[in-house]
Regions:
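Residues that define the transmembrane beta-barrel architecture of outer-membrane proteins
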Residues: 40, 50, 60-66, 124-130, ...
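Short glycine/proline- and aromatic-enriched beta-strand/turn motifs that initiate or cap beta-hairpins
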Residues: 28-77
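Transmembrane beta-barrel strands of outer-membrane/channel proteins
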Residues: 44-50, 102-106, 132, 145-149, ...
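Outer-membrane beta-barrel "beta-signal"
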Residues: 65-71, 258-275
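Repeated loop/turn-to-beta-strand initiation elements of outer-membrane beta-barrel proteins
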Residues: 42, 75-79, 98, 140-144, ...
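Outer-membrane beta-barrel translocator/channel fold
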Residues: 98, 111-121, 177-221
């Protein structure tokens, strides 16, 4: 079962992966100006956030992780965009508003001890997530689609996310990005996280009925992230998101609530890697 300490260590690993994956193409393709070498500023810092223990949970976990990335990430100014634990994007293509690249991350586990109604259903192992994204930027608008597939741990199926972002330049030192989105889940994903097999129903201590969800859209969400430069070196990040389960996900006997909230805050320090 993954708790705060273990999840924090995974965050460290993800942060390290960001550095390594950014460094490799920089040396190989002589694109150090894009990825943050040769004196371009980088940022080091940490995030603390509150997130549901599992999809459909009423209870929440408080987690934290450090990061290091090129300055400007999350503002369209970096080749790396950290959107979530399972959604760290690496922009490899950028042309006339179009951009695309691979993504990586981690999908956390769900333990049957996380909630009374999960007792008897068994654990779901987390694992490494890989995929790709593509998007098109028109002025302050950014339209994107991404695919996420877990390749280690349990085979939990694939997930497609669609999002529309709008960037607001509130002042020379403050940026706000608002977004709306939805996620389409494969039948394997839906069965893993929202389904109840006949065997699980028989073993369920809560007496959950058998439930066989189909592939489809599982949620809709709205969120905002503020980036505030406190001074030339220090930057504050504030983020919040609300999502609601829909379709078969909302009808699942596994969930405790259709509503989920996510909130986080971070602080970073800017420095020059090479002077």
């Amino acid at each position: 079962m993954l708790r705060g300490g273990t999840k924090a260590l995974i965050g460290v690993a993800l942060a390290g992966a960001v550095v390594l994956l950014a460094a490799a193409p920089a040396g190989a393709q002589d694109r150090s100006d894009q990825f943050g070498f040769a004196g371009t500023p980088w940022q080091v810092g940490g995030f603390v956030f509150v997130t549901p223990k599992f999809e459909g949970a009423k209870s929440y976990d408080v987690l934290g992780f450090p990061f290091i990335a090129p300055a400007g990430f999350g503002q369209g100014g970096s080749a790396i965009d950290i959107r979530g634990a399972d959604d760290v994007r690496f922009r490899l293509i950028q042309y006339n508003g179009f951009e695309a690249g691979p993504l990586a991350g981690w999908r956390f586990s769900r333990d049957q001890d996380d909630a009374a109604r999960l007792q008897g259903l068994g654990d779901i192992d987390g694992g490494l997530v890989v995929g790709a994204y593509a998007g098109y930027r028109v002025g302050p608008w950014f339209f994107s689609a991404s695919y996420h597939n877990q390749v280690t741990g349990d085979d939990t199926g694939g997930l497609v996310r669609l999002a529309i972002d709008h960037t607001w330049r509130l002042s020379p030192t403050a940026t706000l990005v608002t977004s709306i989105g939805t996620a389409y889940a494969s039948s394997d994903y839906m069965q893993t996280y929202f389904g109840v097999t006949a065997a699980q129903s028989a073993a369920s201590l809560a007496g959950l009925p058998q439930f066989d969800p189909s592939a489809g859209f599982k949620d809709v969400s709205i969120g905002a992230t503020a980036t505030i430069a406190l001074d030339p070196r220090w930057t504050l990040y504030l983020t919040g998101r609300y999502s609601r389960l829909i379709g078969d996900a909302a009808d699942s006997p596994v969930i405790e609530t259709e509503n989920a909230f996510f909130g986080g805050a971070g602080l970073s320090y800017k420095f020059d890697l090479i002077r």
